């Protein structure tokens, strides 16, 4: 992904896309990337009506022309080099993946509510995904590091998050935070014994866990005082930390090859996404960039 050269921006014709559009302009200016704007549109056909191939092509053409007129206003304020395309399709996720590959996109931007199910998109998307919720340019970036990163995909995922956090924030003159949820000792050590033992294990676990997170952060040349840790489940703790730290953009990871089917600590990104009121950059292990 880094450095960014091409950002694919998905807009919905006739809808309020102001947040996504303005954010794409800000990201292009901050990173120097070129924008490719895609507007997937449904063919102009009544539901349940089966058209002959020629009429179907005409319906698709009419939908693309109508969307093209809608795009004219955006074209007037777009930076130099921006390209626009309206494509008639009944399968927007497939079209988005195809265009991301065609343009070799380094980042996909779209509104947080554009697709109800992100799994088909993330299964094949060749780049990270930024889900936009707000108009404001990000000023505070936070990376969500997962606990129990013993296996290779989880370790790489934490590296991906820290790498992007470290490189993106300076582009915007932004601040950095690293957020994490302290695992529940009762879940990790089910046979620990009495309450005293549980308390001892909890204290020891918190110290060990915090030190582990801080080491990952300092290994990337960042200060350990950027780390914020709270005890509890990630789907509860992370949204609370996002609110406390007034995070604008949360870097969130998924390790599942099939998208959101799995997430660190057994939690799903699907549980966290609806609970955070900020933009979210979704990263996967394959988004890691080897150091030059």
Language model: regions and residue ranges:
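Small/aliphatic-rich secondary-structure junction motif
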Residues: 1-54, 141-199, 219-222, 275, ...
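Structural beta-alpha unit
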Residues: 1-3, 26, 54, 58-61, ...
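A short acidic, glycine-rich active-site loop
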Residues: 55-69, 197-208
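Glycine-rich, Arg-bearing micro-motifs that act as flexible, cationic patches
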Residues: 107-124, 138, 249-275, 289
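Short beta-strand elements of ligand-binding domains
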Residues: 109-112, 129-134, 280-284
């Amino acid at each position: 992904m880094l450095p960014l050269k091409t950002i694919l921006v998905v807009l919905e014709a006739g809808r309020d896309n102001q947040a996504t559009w303005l954010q794409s302009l800000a990201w292009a200016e901050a990173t120097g990337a070129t924008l490719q704007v895609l507007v997937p549109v449904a063919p102009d056909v009544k539901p349940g009506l089966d058209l002959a191939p020629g009429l179907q092509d005409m319906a698709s053409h009419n939908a693309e022309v109508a969307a093209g007129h809608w795009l004219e206003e955006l074209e007037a304020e777009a930076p130099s080099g921006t390209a626009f395309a309206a494509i008639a399709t009944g399968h927007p996720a497939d079209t988005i993946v195809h265009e991301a590959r065609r343009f070799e996109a380094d980042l996909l931007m779209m509104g947080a509510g554009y697709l109800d199910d992100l799994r088909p998109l993330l299964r094949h998307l060749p780049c990270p995904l930024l889900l936009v919720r707000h108009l404001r340019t990000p000023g505070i970036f936070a990376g969500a590091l997962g606990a129990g990163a013993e296996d290779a995909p989880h370790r790489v995922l934490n590296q991906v998050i820290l790498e992007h956090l470290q490189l993106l924030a300076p582009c915007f003159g932004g601040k950095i935070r690293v957020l994490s949820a302290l695992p529940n000792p009762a879940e990790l050590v089910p046979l620990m014994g009495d309450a005293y033992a549980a308390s001892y294990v909890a204290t020891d676990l918190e110290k060990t866990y915090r030190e582990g997170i801080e080491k990952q952060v300092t290994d990337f040349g960042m200060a350990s005082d950027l780390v914020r840790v709270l005890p509890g489940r990630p789907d509860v703790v992370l949204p609370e930390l996002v609110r406390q730290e007034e995070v604008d953009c949360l870097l969130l990871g998924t390790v599942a090859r099939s998208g959101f089917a799995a997430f660190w600590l057994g939690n799903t990104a699907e549980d966290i996404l609806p609970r955070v009121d900020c933009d979210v950059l979704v990263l996967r292990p394959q988004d890691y960039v080897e150091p030059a």
